[in-house]
Amino acid sequence: MGEVDEAFVQALEHRPKLSVTEAEGIPLIDLSALSATNTSIKNPDSTIRDLVVEIGNACKNWGFFQVINHGVPTDKRRSIENMARKFFEQPLEEKRKVRRDEKKVVGYYDTEHTKNVRDWKEVFDFVVESPCLMPTSPDPEDKEIAETYNQWPDYPPEFREACEEYAKEVEKLAYKLMELIALSLGLPPDSFNGFFKDQTTFVRLNHYPPCPAPHLALGVGRHKDAGALTVLAQDDVGGLEVKRKSDGEWVRVKPTPDAYIINVGDIIQVWSNDAYESVEHRVMVNSEKERFSIPFFFFPSHYTMVKPLDELTNEQNPAKYRAYSWGKFLTTRKGSNFKKLEVENVQIYHFRVQELADKLDGALSINNK
């Protein structure tokens, strides 16, 4: 990655501004109430109810928030961060021994694309439940399901254990957050839990090397997360930028020591029938410092049909999306990581009911001519 190949260069309108706007107002939420012995999400007292209001406001107004006193042990986080550094320090040929491809969809990768532009990063992915069941193709008629197994490197020797122990702890946090989000929508706290049986969740270790042209390239181009929830650990270098809902400005999320950055994904947007919105974000790189981050992508089972929840729709607020297969959606997305597409990748707005109505109107007007 010494030279900036044109594959990394963003279109003019998407190139990063090197002057940084620090985000004012991204909520910082203290979860210590969850660990108090006399409180429970199942029977919320006033402190939990206050927390639920905070979470709901953050989801509605930002789609992003940070959490502290979250219950994930610091030593587990430090351990996986150290393992990531050791793994990425190795020569390329060593890392490529666990390279992922279109058949092995987890492992090491260094040529990922976001919106058809190559990202300035290298990654290592592992699934939280192994084997993980996934459709073999995005074709709706193809019912074949494959088992995905993790590929673990020989070095560092403690790598697998550190990854698995960390994932268990963050998974507990993800479930708690989903329960708080359910309450904030007026639902029972366990409303979402069933979707995550046979989950397709994965964890990614990101390494962003120093970039000689940070004004041209991005660590990750602008995108929205396709899953339900993302729980992100970032180091003190920073670089994550969020598109502020109020004015569309790109703002930098300043690292808070030991905090996690949480963002609502597309699935929550659909489940909530647009009450909460998945927000665009991107990652800046810099010319001097490398950066590491570890996102936990909380994904439901492959057989989940994602649609607005019945409890959140009625005659006055009809469903804004038709149901779609999460497994087929994810398989389509995964395939696009390996090649440039001639058309736009699948997005949730392709399933908007209004989009469907517009297409039908268009077809009718053509047929009537």
Regions found by a protein language model. Give the residues of each.
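Peripheral, non-catalytic segments flanking oxidoreductase cores
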Residues: 1-369
